[in-house]
Amino acid sequence: MMNNKKSIVLFYIVTALFWYSLYAYVPIFPTYVESKGISYSMVGIILGSYGFAQMILRIPIGILSDKFNRRKLYVTLGMLAAVSSNIGLWYFDEASLILLFRAFAGVAASMWVVYAVLFSSYFKQADAPKAMGFLLSVTTLGQVSATFTGGIVSGSFSDKHTFLLAAAAGIIGFFLSLMIKKEQKDITKEPVRLKDLLSVGKDRMLMLVSGLAILSQFLTFATTYGFTPVAASKLGASSYELGLLVTISALPGVISGALSGSFFGKRFGERNVITVGFMMTAASVLLIPFINSLTILFLTQIAGGFSKGMVFPLLMGMGIKNIPNDKRATAMGFYQAIYGLGMFLGPVVVGILTDAVSLGTGFVITAAIGFLAAVTAFLSLEKAKSACLDAA
């Protein structure tokens, strides 16, 4: 039996491989699907299926894992779903099957909530938040290393090889997941019930920040994980440059995310930081149709990545701040399921607009949604905060 320290290190490795297997092909995936002669509307639906699967499965998977207390099983199933997705994407070229196996990646990502609960069971309650911080850092490391190396592999071999790279990581992760430690027997968790979800859903602040999170994810999955790589390829970006583009879009968010609550929020106020973050993101998207240089596109995406990183952690924190401790896990499940709608709608809407009008129009409308989110945040967050304080 492994000691606890080795168990934790093993879990970190499994987590990194899990996200690596889901992200290795992401930079080239939009252009890969486009190269199959598939319409932009269908490209958007394929890209959005990842978020759609998470939107409908996250809460049921959380409920089932709580009910049967078999969380290690769901970690292993998540790896299998990721491997199945990657192999299917490598083997099949038909649009319907690409859609199916991309949705399988969303099924795999839906298991993430179980990863977090299982990992937290390795620690005393007081140490769990710090441990989760490390786990989220490992998650980011897995994603960023995947997008960077995926671009290199695609440029050196072919787009198809990125699916094999992702599958290899998933297979290694699957076998390692068989060795991770089960949850502590003395730790129990009350299963989430539908009435609990409906109860926390009535919280005004949680509903507001969940709506803003939908818009935040809309922006991210319409652009960075959606059609920005398509715009870059039209400017002559190589596969390596597409990988680099997605990587440098994510890295600044790691820095701004770490500073969002500890520095920016305290110094300038949460509402102001969220408002400015949405405005900066919208501006970076609005510029895309008018850019004729890859260098300028890279710079705008660095700025956009930094601004997105400021927004999301603050929204998450504000959503559960006034929720009672015994309902915070339920509130987080509600929040995560809700923002999956933005992951789905972002690429779908831009794909439809691109077919109907142009890719540039898709970016302009996406930017408009970002500015709308900024106005909504500025006008509504303080009112909702005051209402919560009055009700307390």
Regions found by a protein language model. Give the residues of each.
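Juxtamembrane intracellular "pre-TM" segments in multi-pass secondary transporters
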Residues: M1-K5, K182-S210
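Helix-loop boundary and gating motifs at the non-cytosolic
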Residues: N4-G51, M207-L208, F218-A232
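Interfacial helix-cap and linker-helix signal at transmembrane-aqueous boundaries
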Residues: V33-E34, L64-S65, I152-F157, A232, ...
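Helix-to-loop junctions at the C-terminal end of transmembrane segments
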Residues: L57-N69, S256-G269
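Helix-breaking motifs and short loop linkers at transmembrane-helix boundaries and internal kinks
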Residues: N69, Y91-D93, F290-N292
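Structural signature of the two symmetry-related core transmembrane helices
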Residues: L73-I87, N272-L286
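Cytoplasmic helix-loop-helix junction between adjacent transmembrane helices
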Residues: F101-V138, M318
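C-terminal membrane-cytosol helix-exit motif in multi-pass small-molecule transporters
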Residues: A167-D186, A373-L381
